[in-house]
């Protein structure tokens, strides 16, 4: 590889423990050079939490690092190999346009992957150019930071730089690179890859590495690989419940887009639901609704079953016993997911204690919302402040009956109405990344070079539970002509 390392005090404290794995898992690869990198956006709060130096990152040398033209002295740039089931079909994949610089160790001792996305061709590019366009990279920046503010586990976005290149898609677009920060980039697809093309020793090496990196607090007397599977199932049950509670539609829940760490990753065709409809799909390529909003829990269980299949040789020496162990573990997902979802929905309705009838109360509300085309986020916002008359549900007989039952339910708990309202305020965001507002910000930035619209949007999204007057603009619904929102997998 070409040597381009430089000593720059960015605050990056890099290791690359992933390279301790067998070489089947990665290829050493420098990012492609770009002609004229310029900083588009820098995440100052994230810089602070990671212990980095914002001033240096904004310098010429710092921007060169974010663009891949230079690499920190301690970096070992690699692209990672993985496979995946895409829309149910297995295929070989890998980092086709991303380079992992290494793992940054924060002053607090936390470990985070630092990855450049859109950094050029790799051995896994499969004929692609390895580049990324500015619009999709800014979009991932906005959505991932909004998800973090909403309290949903997610990869983060440290920076976006423009490259000075034009890249060809349907039209000519401005090139860009996003610096992604993640607990790790180990995916279900990473295990699928080594299960298909590696040895059992290499599979065990990956499993042991994953346990050490993400699940250190294990009881070594138990089967560590069953523990690994169970912990991933728990994390995904929590994550998917949080998606559903907030109305988030990932759009491309392939197994390569399910992380072992439990973070949301890859914001290609994702979007947030406006009108409540379980069949909501935004992705232009999901023509059969495989990854529709209401199907996300089922797909998560399916993906986890694929992970369990890869671990069978490690779960038990007897294949039949291994299958039983895996099936028992996977069967827990539905219960774990439902418990997380019900707990979250109770919070959205100001309910502290549990009653068996709660699920019916919740499902009845969702059914009424679906029937009348109620906005998901704004309905719960209206319930929080008892101003439902401002929504399409105002005056509807079914809703009035439901409302009475809900009020009766609230009287059957010790907590006060004020406490219930506080719980609802902390459970129901006043603002989400509305699709039309995100597009408005992207259009200003990409077409006009005006980042002020995006900055204002990011500021509003950084305080989703604030209920401030300034957020009203970002809570308004799209015009009917823009309701048929469709996304494309640009990220």
From Swiss-Prot:
Enzyme class, UniProt record, top EC level: transferase
Please write the reaction equations for the catalytic activity of this protein: L-seryl-[protein] + ATP = 3-O-(5'-adenylyl)-L-seryl-[protein] + diphosphate; L-threonyl-[protein] + ATP = 3-O-(5'-adenylyl)-L-threonyl-[protein] + diphosphate; L-tyrosyl-[protein] + ATP = O-(5'-adenylyl)-L-tyrosyl-[protein] + diphosphate; L-histidyl-[protein] + UTP = N(tele)-(5'-uridylyl)-L-histidyl-[protein] + diphosphate
Q: Which residues form the active site?
A: 256 (proton acceptor)
Instruction: Extract the InterPro entries matched here.
Output: SelO
Keywords for this protein: ATP-binding, Magnesium, Manganese, Metal-binding, Nucleotide-binding, Nucleotidyltransferase, Transferase
Specify which residues bind ATP according to the UniProt entry for this protein.
Answer: 94, 96-97, 117, 129-130, 180, 187, 266
* Cofactor(s) recorded in Swiss-Prot or TrEMBL: Mg(2+); Mn(2+)
EC number(s) per entry: 2.7.7.-, 2.7.7.108
Q: Does the keyword Metal-binding apply?
A: yes
Describe the function of this protein.
Nucleotidyltransferase involved in the post-translational modification of proteins. It can catalyze the addition of adenosine monophosphate (AMP) or uridine monophosphate (UMP) to a protein, resulting in modifications known as AMPylation and UMPylation.
- Entry similarity comment: Belongs to the SELO family.
Q: Which NCBIfam families match?
A: PRK00029.1
This chain belongs to which protein, by name? Protein nucleotidyltransferase YdiU
């Amino acid at each position: 590889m070409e040597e381009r390392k430089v000593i720059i005090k960015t605050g990056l404290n890099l290791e690359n423990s992933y390279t301790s794995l067998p070489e089947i898992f990665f290829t050493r690869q420098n990012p492609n050079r770009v002609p004229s990198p310029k900083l588009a956006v820098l995440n100052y709060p994230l810089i602070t939490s990671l212990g980095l130096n914002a001033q240096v990152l904004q310098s010429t040398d710092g921007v060169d690092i974010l663009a891949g033209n230079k690499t920190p002295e301690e970096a070992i740039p690699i692209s990672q190999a993985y496979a995946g089931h895409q829309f149910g079909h297995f295929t070989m994949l890998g980092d086709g346009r991303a380079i992992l610089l290494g793992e940054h160790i924060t002053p607090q001792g936390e470990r985070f992957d630092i990855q450049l996305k859109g950094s050029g061709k790799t051995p896994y590019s499969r004929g692609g150019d390895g580049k990324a366009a500015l619009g999709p990279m800014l979009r991932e920046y906005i959505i991932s930071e909004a998800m973090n503010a909403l309290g949903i586990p997610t990869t983060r976005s440290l920076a976006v730089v423009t490259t000075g290149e034009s890249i060809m898609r349907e039209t000519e677009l401005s090139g860009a690179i996003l610096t992604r920060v993640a607990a790790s980039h180990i995916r279900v697809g990473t295990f699928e890859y080594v299960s298909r093309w590696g040895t059992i020793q290499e599979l065990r090496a990956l499993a042991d590495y994953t346990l050490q990196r993400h699940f250190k607090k294990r009881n070594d007397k138990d089967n560590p690989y069953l523990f690994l599977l169970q912990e991933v199932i728990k994390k995904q049950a929590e994550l998917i419940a949080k998606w559903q509670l907030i109305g988030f539609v990932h759009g491309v829940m392939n197994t390569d887009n399910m992380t072992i760490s439990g973070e949301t990753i890859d914001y290609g065709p994702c979007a947030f639901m406006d009108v409540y409809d379980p069949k909501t799909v935004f992705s232009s390529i999901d023509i059969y609704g495989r990854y529709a909003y209401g199907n996300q829990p089922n797909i998560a269980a399916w993906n986890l079953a694929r992970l369990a299949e890869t671990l069978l040789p490690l779960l038990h020496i007897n294949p039949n016993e291994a299958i039983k162990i895996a099936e028992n573990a996977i069967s827990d997902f539905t219960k774990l997911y439902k418990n997380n979802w019900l707990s979250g929905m109770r919070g959205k309705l100001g309910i502290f204690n549990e009653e068996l009838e709660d699920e019916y109360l919740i499902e009845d509300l969702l059914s009424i919302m679906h029937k009348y085309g109620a906005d998901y986020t704004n309905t719960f916002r209206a319930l929080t402040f008892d101003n439902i008359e401002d929504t399409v549900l105002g005056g509807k007989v079914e809703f009035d009956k439901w409302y009475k039952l809900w009020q009766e339910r609230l009287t059957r708990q010790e907590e006060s109405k004020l406490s219930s309202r506080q719980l609802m305020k902390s459970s129901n965001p006043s603002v989400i990344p509305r699709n039309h507002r995100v597009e408005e910000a992207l259009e200003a930035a990409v077409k006009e070079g005006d980042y002020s619209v995006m900055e204002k949007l990011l500021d509003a999204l950084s305080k989703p539970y604030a209920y401030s007057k300034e957020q009203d603009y970002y809570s308004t619904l799209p015009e009917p002509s823009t309701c048929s929102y469709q996304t494309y997998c640009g990220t």
